[in-house]
Amino acid sequence: MNSYWLNVYKPRGISSAKLVSIIKKVLGKVKIGHSGTLDVEAEGVLPLAIGEATKLVQMLIDAKKTYIFTVKFGKQTDSGDYAGKVIAITDYIPSKENAYAICSKFIGTITQIPPAFSALKVNGVRAYKLARDGKEVELKPRNITIYDLKCLNYDEQNATATYYAECSKGTYIRTLAEDLALSLQSLGFVIELRRTQVGIFKEENSIRIDSFNDITKLSLEEKNIKIEAILDDILVLDANDEQAQKIKYGQKCLFDYDKNVDFMWVRYKGVLLTIGSLNKNCFHSLRVFNLTQ
């Protein structure tokens, strides 16, 4: 077994890269990828692609994600979360009614400017490294989509509100929290952030690691999720011996299927062989997988 998914829950206080390096050390010589960095101060679902599953990571990067986050009103920090230094203060705290009502304003496609403290690169350098050095960071605005946003709880005494968000790739929750606060004529920053779902991978089914010293290769492999799991709702065709050989050698391959398909996968002897598209019965391979039964 060398190609599968692991639905790992990243705890607060450790970087995504560090978590990957720990898992890699346990599993040995194997390629590992993940679906998108979680901030050190954040926690939650971090699906890991093992072996050939890394060829499907882009699908998870593009998938919808859900978060639960808590905003502290009245202050703004340079990083957008509690780890940063306070750069602005206001006495105005939004009402409970407004904290709930503002959500509808953000649902749909909106423009967002990524935070300076982010992993995006500026002239080859990570933005957060420039920001930490006190250098000015200019990042271009981008369009993102908020599919759902709702206030789950409002704590008047502590001036906080907890929100649930379902969003597209490229969404920065710290920026969303700041924009929510600004729209409420206040300031705010994130004090808690938890990613609850990435595509098919959900928080309730994730691997909780209480102690990294207790991780074993066997304990991880027992929690494996088959590589095809994220393809379950996508068209699949079965290849015969001749078709499979042509696909493996990058040759033209025809299927008896009348419709054009932008994205699909092909199975050979019950195992994922390739992903690609179909145009006028001709299959065009995007990725070929080296898997065995």
Swiss-Prot record:
Catalytic site:
D39
Reactions this protein catalyses:
uridine(55) in tRNA = pseudouridine(55) in tRNA
An example of a Pfam family matching this protein is TruB_N
InterPro entries of this UniProt entry? PsdUridine_synth_cat_dom_sf, PsdUridine_synth_N, tRNA_psdUridine_synth_TruB, TruB_C
Query: At the top level of its lineage, which domain of life is listed?
Result: Bacteria
What are the alphabetically sorted keywords of the record?
Isomerase, tRNA processing
Regarding protein family, the annotation reads: Belongs to the pseudouridine synthase TruB family. Type 1 subfamily.
Q: What does this protein do?
A: Responsible for synthesis of pseudouridine from uracil-55 in the psi GC loop of transfer RNAs.
Spell out the protein name for this chain. tRNA pseudouridine synthase B
The UniProt gene name for this protein comes to: truB
